[in-house]
Amino acid sequence: MDQTLSNFGTVFVFLVLGIVFVVGGYLTARMLRPSRPNEEKLSTYECGEPAVGSAWVKFNIRFYVVALIFIIFDVEVVFLYPWATVFKQLGMFALVEVLIFAGILVLGLVYAWVKGDLDWVRPTPNIPKMPELPKRHSSGRSNG
């Protein structure tokens, strides 16, 4: 019990020191740096070239979907690495657990693939058009 508290205490101390280090560095830099904003400093910087257009560019939503899928599988690798280092000690039960974990992620990938989220150019849907009604011809008489 004391060993567990000691381990958590170590993690807590490192967490607090990390937060103090980041906040302290931020506050120190904010107090010591000069703040002289002008028009040139507040303008958009594009590699030394004059800015063209707005800085707000619309990106295709497909970039977001691809990035999310990449992050999901990147995190999967992060979870698999510790398992792979102790695989022989954990035995068959851990192998089954990892296969279930990977299977769930593969099912998610297949679902995204079947749904068409991985297709960059989506086919346009074939929407049937309404048939045109025959035009009525007036008999030349007016209703007035």
Swiss-Prot record:
It comes from the Bacteria. GO terms for molecular function: NADH dehydrogenase (ubiquinone) activity; NADH:ubiquinone reductase (non-electrogenic) activity; quinone binding. Its EC number is 7.1.1.-. It is a multi-pass membrane protein. It catalyses: a quinone + NADH + 5 H(+)(in) = a quinol + NAD(+) + 4 H(+)(out). The chain crosses the membrane at residues 8-28, 63-83, 90-110. It is found in: Cell inner membrane. NDH-1 is composed of 14 different subunits. Subunits NuoA, H, J, K, L, M, N constitute the membrane sector of the complex. Belongs to the complex I subunit 3 family. NDH-1 shuttles electrons from NADH, via FMN and iron-sulfur (Fe-S) centers, to quinones in the respiratory chain. The immediate electron acceptor for the enzyme in this species is believed to be a menaquinone. Couples the redox reaction to proton translocation (for every two electrons transferred, four hydrogen ions are translocated across the cytoplasmic membrane), and thus conserves the redox energy in a proton gradient. This is NADH-quinone oxidoreductase subunit A. It comes from Chlorobaculum parvum (strain DSM 263 / NCIMB 8327). The lineage of its organism: Bacteria, Pseudomonadati, Chlorobiota, Chlorobiia, Chlorobiales. The gene is nuoA.
